[in-house]
Amino acid sequence: GEAKMVAVLRTFGDEVRETAIEEVNRICKGIGIAFACDIEVNLEEGYAATYNDSALIDLVESSATAELGESAVRHITQPFSGSEDFSFFGKLTGTPCAFMMIDAGHGENPVSLHNGKIVFDEKVMVSGVSAMSRIALEYLKK
């Protein structure tokens, strides 16, 4: 017989990611030995963790606050485990990064981003473009 397992591995840092991959391989090898079967591990390199530049985060936060008001900006301090290709931009180019999100959902019981029932408040796009423009202009002044 044959079995197939597919999983997504998300980590908050490169070192932890390397350790996790080593552990997946070690555990699979052990299972193969324990059950006298062949196990093949195929790992596809996905998206790495995004590292936010603290100075750039300060600029993004202050610019967005100046443009939209303090009540419209929320600093997220906990790591975010969404899978995002944004990390490659910073890693490949060596460019400082600051990941920000724009909340365009609304309602009492919001649904997740990838839900077919999500409804975006398109008026938020104006605020988002306004904030990003301000951020870009402030960045260019430095």
Explain the meaning of each model-derived region.
Residues G1-K142:
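Metal-dependent amide/peptide-bond hydrolase catalytic core
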